[in-house]
Amino acid sequence: GDTVTSNRSSFTIVSLGFSKKIIKRNNAKIGDDIYVTGNLGDSYIGLNILKKKIYIKKKFKNYFINKYYLPDLPIKVLKFIHKFANSSIDISDGLFADLEKLINKQKLGFIINANYLPISKNLCFYLKKKNQKPLNFIGKGDDYQIIFTSSKKNRNYINKLSKRINQKITLIGTITNNYKQRMINRDGKLLKSSNYEGYFHNF
């Protein structure tokens, strides 16, 4: 993911270690809840401001650009995720693109509730002002949040943990047994997640 070019110097740091329990991306279970940390979409707005594709007031402009350059990494939850997650993946290419990777090679599907997708107050304000739908922005990538799946029996624990460590964790959907089912439920209407694909790597 860091094989890009820049006219500035850059440094990559790799840390290796041991884990008591490895959370794999391909271990989701039928009926698992799907969670995501943090907010989605801010970074995409910031990128498009930098590309001069979006023009916005300065007070919001700096907020979104900072979210692109310095995303809110969900570091606090990493210490606990092995206690409740069956599968997990980070969001770099976009919510729905990375969900596809999470269930790759498993005969599973998912339904995401669009009304529960977490967005910031600033993004909510921007979308209302521009009369835009959140789905057009939250699946584009560069969020660097975590998607994970967990048994329904862990809901209470996850809710309490979210408050205790002050880390936003949102229940957004369910893993299903229909491998052709990649859907978004928006106000009772089922939409194909492929309509909201994120970043595609050309290699």
Spans of features found by a protein language model:
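Helix-biased detector of long, well-ordered alpha-helical tracts
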Residues: 1-203
